[in-house]
Amino acid sequence: MNGEAKRTRLDQRRAPIHEALENFRRMRVVPFDVPGHKRGRGNPELTAFLGQQCVGVDVNSMKPLDNLCHPVSVIREAEELAADAFGAAHAFLMVGGTTSSVQSMVLTACKRGDEIILPRNVHRSVLNALVLCGAVPVYVNPEVDNRLGISLGMKREQVAKAIAEHPNAVAVLVNNPTYYGICSDLRAIVKMAHEAGMLCLADEAHGTHFYFGNGLPVSAMAAGADMASVSMHKSGGSLTQSSLLLIGPNVHQGYVRQIINLTQTTSGSYLLMSSLDISRRNLALRGRQVFHQVADMAEYAREEINAVGGYYAFGKELCNGDSVFDFDTTKLSVHTLDIGLAGIEVYDILRDEYDIQIEFGDIGNILAYLSIGDRPQEIERLVSALAEIKRRYHTDGTGLLSQEYIDPVVAASPQEAFYAPKKSLPLRETEGMVCSEFVMCYPPGIPILAPGERITKEILNYIEYAKAKGCSMTGPEDPDILHLNVLA
């Protein structure tokens, strides 16, 4: 292919799925296929709610629109454009959220009995994948910031030690960044993994903007990682549940497609795919400018919130060259314990009394997620609300827990524990037993307990405290979490 043809094919102004849907809309095709709402005519209430523009392109795979399971035309073009925009060898459009991207990434790298090196503060989707494939986690317990009570990144020395002690591990997985914006030394970890013959996988659910930002942490593809799961819907502007799976040149594209097709729907949503296509175009053309503005807004918010007093909106000052190698300056994470309120309490007050919905609140912190749709006036409203909350609710904070992360005691693999014979016991009677299910606050979706981990008094205290403070707890069969399933 000559250079001119290549430039035309990779013209980032194009959005081939979007263009194909617009052409299809003009064709006025009579539908005798699914979906059964028939362009909205069969469900007028849905059409009134979502709009004709939306339901009119909620269509099934067909020749002019390609097929997500085996793309050969417009979806293939959209994937090539995404790969070009993100600096990847190939990109896969994912419609099962970044959960499906992460699981496909782990299932590609690991088989039953394989070891994978990873931090324990991973999203539940990583551990779910281990339940499915039977791989065995080798945890690198992250450093903890004792003031903030949050887990940090993996230290280079810890990763090197894990690789040396587990030379047959097949991969190292890295959060880039964590929910709080903390980044490990990704380039160094990639180098260590590759020198040991291992893949390096990156969970970039919260790092889409790294590919389009000046002064932001390094992206996984730029660092040489082999695979990366990217939540376009979080900071990239696409619809919820849409995601990208990026791979480097040393990963077999065809095999990854087979892995994806094991679990991803055969009825890919064109609403989600076109949103990925349009959002990729937007980021490729305007992303650097937009995310520079987002970082500026976040920095302004940090300064204003810290000026209120009592709160600590943290940033790059946490960087220490290792466990906090870099920090995502678009993240607005705020420590709340010094005003005497848990993060989840501030979260609830903001929503219930000020009509401000932030991303999450945990034991000691809140996160306000800033991205391409935010404006300065919303920042001012958030800062004013936090100042008023401090004035109205400030207390001495006696009895507040401060630690968000508890080192696990692993007694069995996730798959072994999940499928083993089990029994249900009252919460306080489970101390010392091995858990067979997940327990987590969502968001952020990082398990407090995972299958195969021993239940300690410290963990039980944390669960009861989080419940009492109003954290949304998920995972166990018992929705009230009065009982837990343990190995029989």
PLM region descriptions:
Residues 113-174:
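PLP-dependent aminotransferase-like
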Residues 279-302, 378:
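Structural signature of PLP-dependent enzymes
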